[in-house]
Amino acid sequence: MHRSLSLRAVVCLSTLLPASLLYAAPDVDIETLKQELLELKQRYEAQQKALAVLEQRVRQVEDQPATPAPKRLAKSPADFKQSGSTVAASSGTGGATGGSSYGQSLKDDSEPAQSVSNLYNEASGFFGNGKFSFETGITYARYDARQLTLNGFLALDSIFLGNINLDRIKADNWTLDLTGRYNLDNRWQFDVNVPVVYRESTYQSGGASGGDPQATSEESVSRDPTIGDVNFGIAYKFLDESATMPDAVVSVRVKAPTGKEPFGIKLVRSTANDNLYVPESLPTGNGVWSITPGLSLVKTFDPAVLFGSVSYTHNLEDSFDDISSDVNQKVGGKVRLGDSFQFGVGVAFALNERMSMSFSVSDLIQRKSKLKPDGGGWQSIVSSDANAGYFNVGMTIAASENLTIVPNLAIGMTDDAPDFTFSLKFPYYF
């Protein structure tokens, strides 16, 4: 009896246990799902906060004005025109917001850097930055020449018998240039230039101390600051640069003989050396009227700017009361200075928005001058022809929107050219 009851109890318990387990399992799964759902909600809230922060940053960026693209430094006028047409097309076809900001960016980019404008001014000689401009410039030129004089003959084609004399001339020239310019409609330019010249020359020669070839003597002559030859010019810009054509300017310059002419200046013999003759004064001008037509071209090949110029100077014939250099002698006559031809080519680069640098070579070729004493015929002046070649290194520095600093170094490459010439100009635009 007891065994049957125990068996029945075991059977009942075995049937009830799986049912209790089945009811307990869903409770555990629900708790797990609730925990996972809570974690997902927390992640969602964190993501929502992150999205809100990102959205706020995007709005701040959109509210800021668009930053224009960097300016091209060596941009030609042809590019300016193309940029202008692109701006018009963008504003006409673009959207209300994106099109206007993009067009404004192109408009800002179409404006040339100030260094490029200064570069064009110096290369073409046409200053179009303002209606009026005034330029102050200082120029220093150094000239040092030696001449070997042989008085004797060669023996056995290799031995020189006689006297050897070495002559030397050292000259320092300072010029203060005052130039005023007027620009009319960025097409015509009128200018006048007034130079103030200071000169000092030192002459050396052997044969001092009674003709001793080993002894040398020297004499110095100076000229106080004096106005030189005033000149004025007219320039016309007849061609604007395009994709295929350069910027072209034609000019005419007239020089008046307002300085001290070199004719009639007497050569005085040195008291210490019979071989040395020095002028009693120094000239500050040519003494004759001259006219110089010229042409200058400028073309952009980004990032470089190529430029070139050519000019021809014709000196007018004139008469003087005295053309002799002998002391106590006065001879009137006519003077015909030799005409000159000058050309130059170079390349320039814009270093940044305020500075540019240029390199160029130039050459001046002058014909011989002639004199005609009263009652005589025309006579050519010995060694009056010249060939002066230069290598030029220049810069433009935009000190402000109105003031530019232009240093330039010219190195003489031929015997007729000064050893070097350094100039510093300060054009100011009103």
UniProtKB/Swiss-Prot annotation:
Stated consequence of mutating R181E: Allows secretion of FapC across the outer membrane
Record topology, Extracellular segments: 143-172, 199-224, 257-288, 315-339, 366-386, 413-419
UniProt topological domain (Periplasmic) ranges: 25-131, 184-189, 239-246, 299-304, 349-356, 398-404, 429-430
Protein name in UniProt: Functional amyloid transporter FapF
Keyword Aminoacyl-tRNA synthetase in annotation: no
Region (Alpha helical plug): 113-125
Family recorded in the similarity comment: Belongs to the amyloid transporter (TC 9.B.153) family.
Domain of life: Bacteria
UniProtKB keywords: Cell outer membrane, Coiled coil, Membrane, Protein transport, Signal, Transmembrane, Transmembrane beta strand, Transport
Any one annotated GO CC term: cell outer membrane
Composition skew (Gly residues), residue ranges: 92-101
Organism: Pseudomonas fluorescens
Domain notes: An asymmetric coiled coil domain that trimerizes in the absence of the rest of the protein is found just after the signal peptide. The periplasmic N-terminal domain (residues 25-106) is required to secrete FapC across the outer membrane. The crystal structure of the transmembrane domain (residues 107-430) is a 12-stranded beta barrel that is plugged from the periplasmic side by a 13-residue helical plug; the plug is pinned to the beta barrel lumen by a salt bridge between Glu-122 and Lys-425. Single channel gating indicates the beta barrels may be unplugged in full-length mature protein.
Function comment: Transports fibril components across the outer membrane. Upon overexpression of the endogenous six-gene locus (fapA-fapF) in situ cells form large clumps during liquid growth, make large amounts of biofilm and produce amyloid fibrils. Expression of the 6 gene operon in E.coli strain BL21(DE3) induces flocculation and biofilm formation with copious extracellular fibrils.
GO biological process: protein transport
Recorded topology in the membrane: Multi-pass membrane protein
The keyword Cell membrane belongs to this UniProt entry's keyword annotation: no
Coiled coil regions, renumbered to chain: 29-64
Region (Disordered) location: 62-114, 203-223
Main localization category: membrane
Protein localization: Cell outer membrane
Oligomer and partners: Homotrimer.
Signal peptide segment: 1-24
Substitution effect: E135R: Allows secretion of FapC across the outer membrane
Site (Forms salt bridge with Lys-425): E122
Disruption phenotype annotation: Deletion of just fapF in an overexpressing strain yields cells without amyloid fibrils. Deletion of the entire fapA-fapF six-gene locus shows no visible growth phenotype.
